[in-house]
Structure formats: C-alpha cells, structure tokens
Amino acid sequence: MKFEKIAFVATEMPEAEAARKALSRRYGDAKPEEADVIVALGGDGLMLQTMHQHMKRRIPIYGMNRGSVGFLMNEYRDDNLTERLAAAECATIHPLRMRASLADGSCHEALAINEVALFRETYQAAKIRISIDGKTRMEELVCDGVLVATPAGSTAYNLSAQGPIVPIDAALLALTPISAFRPRRWRGALLSHRAQLRFEILEAEKRPVSAVADHTEFRQVREVEVEEDGSIDMLMLFDPDHGLEERIITEQFLY
C-alpha cells in the first residue's frame, strides 16, 4: 500500500520531538486530518492516545519507538520510511465499549483498546457479581478488581495480572481477576469476542469501585457492561516478520 500524505505525531520527550522534526523535513508533514497515514513517535502510551484520537477515521497508524515501552511500536529508523510503510502488514483492532452506571444515577460510555478494568477504591476488597450473556457465572468475586482485555491488550495489564496472552487473530476476550481472594483459585476465563459482560458491584457504598477504559475513569460505579464494538476498525501497521501476531507469540516464550 502506497501512502501519499504522512502525518507525524510525537511525545514531548526530546528524543521523540527531534525525530519528528527530522522526519518532517525529509518526508513532509501533513495535518493528521488530511493524511492517509499517521506515524507516531514515542512509546505505547502515544500509540494508544493516537488510536483513540483517530478511532473513527479508519486511518492506518505506524508507530516507531522513541519512548520507554514499545510493544506496539516498530524499530526507529529514519531511512526508507516510505518503503517501510508500503511493505507494512496491517492488523485490525476492535475496541471494547464500556457502559458504566454510577451511584448518582448517571450513565457513561467509553472505549478501550487494551482493557476495561474495575478496581476497589479503598482498603476494603471489592465484591463483584459477574454475568455473561445474561447468565450469572460468578455470584460473588472478592478481589482487588477484575479486567476484560482484548487480544491487543492481553500483553499489557492483563499479563501482569497473570492473565493469558491471546493471539491477535483469536476471536476471544480475556476475563482476568486482580488479586482474587475468593474464590482464591479462580484464574479467569477466555470468552467469545461476542460475549456481553455485566459486572454488578455488591455492597457498593461500603466497598466502592471505579471503572477504567484505558485512560478514562469513572468512580463509584454500580454496574458496568462491556462488549466488543465490531463497528469500529482501527488499523495498525507493522514491519513484515515483526507484526503484532509475531510479537504476541514471542512474548509467550520470554522468561
């Protein structure tokens, strides 16, 4: 695929900003809203931010690592960028849609590329009832929290919480507890990407819980619904032989 107009975005870190200026001089710099590809210079945080900002445009985004964490980024090189973009492999990502009902009666929605997570707000453990497709699957999970991760997000917080790594082309979501106290041996579940999840907060006034979709947080939630939004396609570009699928496989053999 050949791209005519490239837009460069970068973090405020000196290394990233210097790379943006150098690449802009060499390849030109279109406005993001006029470009047909965006090159993000930074770490995974910038990649997620850029994907959120342009989520509904279906514009391909190619990341190059000028940050600290670069799982979603390609290696930085200033040579042959147009050729790299033309040869890049594309991964299509669908976000999670979270609907949160709060203690004050209000309802809010947010989208997540990596995960939707529920956390206890105080020293009291959270108590959460979990339903899948309208059927209660766990009457009471006593925990620090619980999360739902996409395949793209399964190597992020989900992995740190001992959740499974999910291949990028698997039509699955990972449901993972965070420091489960009861049932102590429950390690979560793999669910169809079409699953509709509902989390009900038990003893909510005594045990307040917040809900976070990537970087969007709502506090004192009473109920949270989560499902994949298949109507939104996000396109990520990766160098051949170093695509997201390969990275996820490699991650499973690190020790």
Curated annotation (Swiss-Prot):
InterPro entries listed in its UniProt record: ATP-NAD_kinase_N (IPR017438), ATP-NAD_kinase_PpnK-typ_C (IPR017437), NAD/diacylglycerol_kinase_sf (IPR016064), NADK (IPR002504)
Main location as per UniProt: cytoplasm
GO molecular function, one term: NAD binding
Broad class of enzyme this protein falls into: transferase
Active site feature: D44
NADP among keywords: yes
Recorded catalytic activity of this chain's protein: NAD(+) + ATP = ADP + NADP(+) + H(+)
UniProt-annotated binding residues for NAD(+): D44, G45, N114, E115, D144, A152, T155, A156, Y157, N158, L159, S160
Gene3D superfamilies: Probable inorganic polyphosphate/atp-NAD kinase, domain 1, Probable inorganic polyphosphate/atp-NAD kinase, domain 2
Keywords for this protein: ATP-binding, Cytoplasm, Kinase, NAD, NADP, Nucleotide-binding, Transferase
One term under GO cellular component: cytoplasm
Cofactor(s) of this protein: a divalent metal cation
Role noted for this protein: Involved in the regulation of the intracellular balance of NAD and NADP, and is a key enzyme in the biosynthesis of NADP. Catalyzes specifically the phosphorylation on 2'-hydroxyl of the adenosine moiety of NAD to yield NADP.
Family: Belongs to the NAD kinase family.
Name used for this protein in its record: NAD kinase
Source taxonomy: Bacteria, Pseudomonadati, Pseudomonadota, Alphaproteobacteria, Hyphomicrobiales
